C-alpha cells in the first residue's frame, strides 16, 4: 500500500496570536504527540509551499486578500473581533492554503491519505472577510484547485468541527461538484447551518446540515454518519475527500459542549475512508483548543488515515444514542430524501 503523509512546517507557528486561544501551542502539542508515537514518527512529512495569491483568489476577493497583506505589512491588527493578523500572518496564511494544495498534489500522485496540520484554520473565512480565527479558507481554496487543475468532478467535504463551516458552505452553495456535509452544535457560533440550508441552483441538494444539541457522544456521532452522511456520500461517489477536522467536539474542549472522545475521531475517519477507498482523503486541521485532547484526537485521525493502532481513550459517556440525536437525524432525512435515497 502506498505511504501516507503529514503536511507541516514550523512556519505555521509564525502566525503569532499571543495569548489567543488559537495559538501556535496547538500545532506544537500535535507535533510533540506525533514525535512521541513510534508509528506516527515514521509517517513522511511533506513541506508545504505558499499558495500564489491567484490560487487564493479562486475563493476570495482580491481586494480582501490585498487588505490582509497590507495589515500584516503594517505590523498587524484585528481583522474582526475574533481574528488576529500578525506581521507574518499573511505569508503564513498563504502557506496554510498551500499546505492543503500540496496535499491535493500528493494524493493525486502516489500518497495514500494526508493529514494537513496547518494554521490559521479556515472554514469560517468567506469571500471578502475573515471570521472566527480564519483568514483564508484552506479547504475551499484547495477544493477549487482540485476542480480547476486536476479535472476532479466530485469533491466531498466533511466538516465535524463543533462550529458550522459557514465559509466553506458559502463557497459551494450553488455547485453540484462539491458535496458539503456538516455536523455542528446549535445554537452556537456562527449561527448558520440549519436543516433547510441545502444549496441553491445547480447546488441544491449538495449541502447537508445536521445541527446538533450539546452533549452528543461518540455513539451519537457514529449514528449520524451511518444513518445519513455515509449513505449520501456513497451515492455521490467522491473522487477526492476533505475533512475539516475540528477536534473541538471533544468533551475536554473549553469552547464546545460535545462529549466525543479521541476514539470518535478514529471512528469517524474510518467511515470517511470507506467512501474514498482509493486513498484520496485529506484531513485538514480546523478547531480544537484543549491541547492534550487536540493532540490525542489528531493522532487518532492519523492512526486511521495511515493504518496504525492508537490507544483507545477510556470513558463512560459514550454508550447509547439520545432521542435528541435520533429525532434530528430523522428531520434531516426528511429534508434530504428529496435529493438522496435514504
Where are these regions (language model features)?
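N-terminal low-complexity, Ser/Thr- and acidic-residue-enriched intrinsically disordered segments
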Residues: 1-58
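A general "terminal functional-core" signal
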Residues: 2-7, 66-342
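Residue-level marker of positions within ordered structural domains that often coincide
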Residues: 11, 35, 61, 105, ...
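Low-complexity, intrinsically disordered regions enriched in charged/polar residues
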Residues: 24, 50, 58, 62, ...
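Short glycine-centered helix-capping/turn motifs at secondary-structure transition points
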Residues: 38-41, 63, 150
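Charged, often glycine-rich, active-site loop that binds/positions anionic groups
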Residues: 49-73
Amino acid at each position: 500500500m502506498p505511504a501516507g503523509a503529514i503536511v507541516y512546517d514550523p512556519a505555521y507557528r509564525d502566525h503569532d496570536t499571543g495569548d489567543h486561544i488559537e495559538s501556535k501551542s496547538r500545532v506544537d502539542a500535535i507535533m510533540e504527540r506525533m514525535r512521541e508515537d513510534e508509528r506516527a514518527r515514521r509517517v513522511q512529512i511533506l513541506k508545504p509551499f505558499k499558495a500564489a495569491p491567484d490560487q487564493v483568489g479562486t475563493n476570495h476577493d482580491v481586494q480582501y486578500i490585498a487588505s490582509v497583506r497590507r495589515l500584516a505589512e503594517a505590523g498587524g491588527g484585528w481583522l474582526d473581533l475574533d481574528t488576529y493578523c500578525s506581521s507574518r500572518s499573511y505569508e503564513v496564511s498563504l502557506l496554510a492554503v498551500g499546505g492543503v494544495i500540496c496535499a491535493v498534489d500528493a494524493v493525486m500522485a502516489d500518497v495514500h491519505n494526508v493529514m494537513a496540520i496547518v494554521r490559521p484554520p479556515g472554514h469560517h473565512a468567506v469571500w471578502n472577510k475573515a471570521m472566527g480565527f480564519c483568514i483564508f479558507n484552506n479547504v475551499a481554496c484547495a477544493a477549487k484547485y482540485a476542480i480547476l487543475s486536476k479535472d476532479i468532478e466530485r469533491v466531498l467535504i466533511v466538516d465535524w468541527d463543533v462550529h458550522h463551516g459557514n465559509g466553506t458552505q458559502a463557497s459551494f452553495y450553488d455547485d453540484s461538484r462539491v458535496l458539503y456535509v456538516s455536523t455542528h452544535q446549535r445554537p452556537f457560533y456562527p449561527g448558520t447551518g440549519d436543516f433547510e440550508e441545502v444549496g441553491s441552483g445547480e447546488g441544491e441538494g449538495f449541502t447537508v446540515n445536521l445541527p446538533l444539541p450539546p452533549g452528543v457522544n461518540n455513539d451519537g456521532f457514529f449514528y449520524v454518519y451511518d444513518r445519513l452522511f455515509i449513505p449520501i456520500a456513497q451515492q455521490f461517489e467522491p473522487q477526492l475527500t476533505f475533512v475539516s477536522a475540528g477536534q473541538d467536539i471533544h468533551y475536554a474542549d473549553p469552547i464546545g459542549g460535545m462529549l466525543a472522545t479521541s476514539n470518535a475521531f478514529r471512528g469517524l475517519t474510518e467511515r470517511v475512508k470507506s467512501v474514498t477507498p482509493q486513498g484520496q482523503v485529506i484531513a485538514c486541521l480546523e478547531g480544537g483548543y484543549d491541547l492534550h485532547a487536540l493532540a490525542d484526537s489528531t493522532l487518532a485521525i492519523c492512526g486511521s488515515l495511515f493504518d496504525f493502532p492508537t490507544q483507545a481513550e477510556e470513558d463512560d459517556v459514550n454508550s447509547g444514542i439520545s432521542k435528541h440525536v435520533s429525532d434530528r437525524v430523522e428531520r434531516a432525512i426528511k429534508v434530504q430524501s428529496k435529493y438522496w435515497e435514504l
